[in-house]
Amino acid sequence: MTLRIETALADIKIATPCLVLDREQIAKNYKNFCHKMKDIDIFYAVKANPHPDVLSLLVSENAYFDCASFQEITLVLAAGSHPSNICFGSTLKKASDIADAYKVGVRYFTFDAKEELQKISDHAPGSSVCCRIITNDFGTGAQWPLNRKFGCDEDMAVDLMSEAGDLGLIPSGISFHVGSQQTEPTAWQAPIAQLSRIFRQLAELGIALDTINIGGGFPTTFGDDAVPDIFTYAKVIKAALNVHFGDKKPRVIAEPGRALVGDAGIIVSEVVLVAQKSSNDSQRWVYLDVGRFHGLAETEGEAIRYRLTVPERQDSATTPAIIAGPTCDSVDTLYEHNPVEMPVALKSGDIVLVHDTGAYTATYSSVGFNGLSPLRVCLVEDVNQMKFPKLQAI
């Protein structure tokens, strides 16, 4: 949570919806992560928040970058990073994007299928490659599992990495992902064991890998849902690495996104309407000017439960309310099965803060669904530029 944002918003009303970011909190999170994960190289997952000021900050901290597209690579390079600090980490890349990345100097690519490996060979010759595997625990403990769409099994990983050299590529490492917002530190144990088996099998074939990629998934705190400290994750991960690799550990990299930027943002929204469906209905619906199509996509299935506060009505009595977005799509309902406590006195025009929204919000925002503008983003020091006078009733 960032008090700087709440303090900055206390005396002004800004144009909504708007995501306000605190770079000081991001810098603090990054330094803490590096300290707790000592000897592990940090590749920021750009997809979490690719705002230019976020990227330039992390460049100044000497971070590495995990990019999901050539467009993200372009943003990172524009922020001042060197192509040698970039991994093209998506396993789904057009041949033209691989070629474009290679042209600007990127030499590290991830894959999980034979055809993808061939594309890298054709368009990025001589590059280092990392094969992503499926974890055996199927994303248990994650709020947002990622295990079905990506990765291959252990046997295929061995076969593909065995072919990489013959294709003119450098077989470098194996990666996995335990799922986003992973609240179980032990989730990394089994995949690290899987990696050790693959390393041994390839070593027997004369192929020495040099990198372990333990992926992302490191969580941030949402509301009252406490998560383990990063140090707890570090202890479990390093213990597993010691068990399975001993003193012969290769380079280890991690790809945090949410853990670095999640708690560094607050979406400022406005109540559009408070309604009931009949005169006898006690259930309120609260419609905000931000919803599933404006950055809150991770409320899908109510997986991520953001904390909502109403600064002007902190002392008001509350009752549960269904929370929905502003569009003409019924899917744009955020919390219906588990309504949120909202002030009884809440009315249209009230400001609602959606906390811990620094990750996976603005990048999810639609370009113009229902004609509504994408979610605006500003830095906390620039909120004065986003303000507007309160409307006066006629």
Descriptions of predicted regions:
Residues 57-58, 80-82, 102-103, 123-126, ...:
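Short, glycine/charged-enriched secondary-structure capping and boundary segments
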Residues 41-43, 64, 83-87, 108, ...:
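Structural preference for beta-strand elements that scaffold enzyme active sites
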Residues 5, 236, 247-394:
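Charged (often Lys/Glu-rich) extended helix/loop segments that serve as interaction or gating elements
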Residues 22-25, 29, 50-54, 72, ...:
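General structural feature for long, well-ordered alpha-helical segments within catalytic domains
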Residues 24, 45-51, 68-72, 91-93, ...:
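Active-site beta-loop-alpha junctions enriched in small/polar residues
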Residues 135-275, 370-372:
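Active-site loop/helix belt of alpha/beta enzymes
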